[in-house]
Amino acid sequence: EEGAVTGVRGEKDTYPAEAVVLATGGVSYPATGSTGDGYRMAAQLGHEIVPPHGSLVPLVSEDEACRQMQGLALKNVELTVLNRKGKAIFREFGEMLFTHFGVSGPLVLSASAHLRNWEKDTYRLSIDLKPALDEQKLESRILRDLGEAPNRSVERIFSGLVPHSMVPVILNRLGMDPQQQANAVTREQRRALVQLLKHFTMPVTGPRPVAEAIITSGGVKVGQVQPATMASKLV
């Protein structure tokens, strides 16, 4: 009334109040009862609504490697997200998980909050599988492993470098025969392996549905809300 909220009107009754708290939740996790109705209510009061979308959400990748490594959790890796221009927009150390649809886990959920421009930009992930070693030290480690078992297959050698389910993917990307002996590995193959372990890349095509997101990004435009009290500046 006269630009002020004076209560809540239900289907049968009206509840007068000096103030009304609008706390309906976002559109993520609808199983909790959050339907996003609060956006409609706020809009009816004149508030501008920034289109809501899921945040802290798993990411979809069409890279077949994700399906091949489904269920594999990587620990102590560094994840970098690059945009179309190759600029790093996220970099963090931690854990992630390969799934049947792409990638998930703490690192990926954190990264998803920085990917807001799917309509105009493209993104790819770059995983440093050995962040504790620079390229020179990693190559020395590989040389040592190859030299200690010169007649062993690279398939077995690589199992000491990466998780077992990742070995076929590594060999496929390098174009190497799993049964190639360690003493037959060329300098070029060794350096290609170093690059792959430090920059294991894959494209991502978008986030999973908002129903799977942990939080909602967007909603009532923050400039129309008092930051100290969260009270509306409009009513």
Where are these regions (language model features)?
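Glycine-rich beta-alpha-beta "Rossmann" dinucleotide-binding loop(s) and their flanking helix/strand
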Residues: P30-V50
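A conserved short coil-to-beta-strand element within the FAD-binding core of flavoproteins
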Residues: E1-A4
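An anion/pyrophosphate-binding glycine-rich loop and adjacent beta-alpha core
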Residues: H47-H53, P58-Q181
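General beta-strand structural signal in soluble alpha/beta enzymes
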Residues: L22, I49-P52, G206-P207
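A glycine-rich dinucleotide-binding beta-alpha-beta segment and adjacent secondary-structure elements
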Residues: P168-V235
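Glycine-rich nucleotide phosphate-binding loop and flanking beta-alpha elements
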Residues: V27-P30, G105, L115, A228-T229
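Short hydrophobic core segments
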Residues: V8, Y15-P30, A42-A43, M96-F101, ...
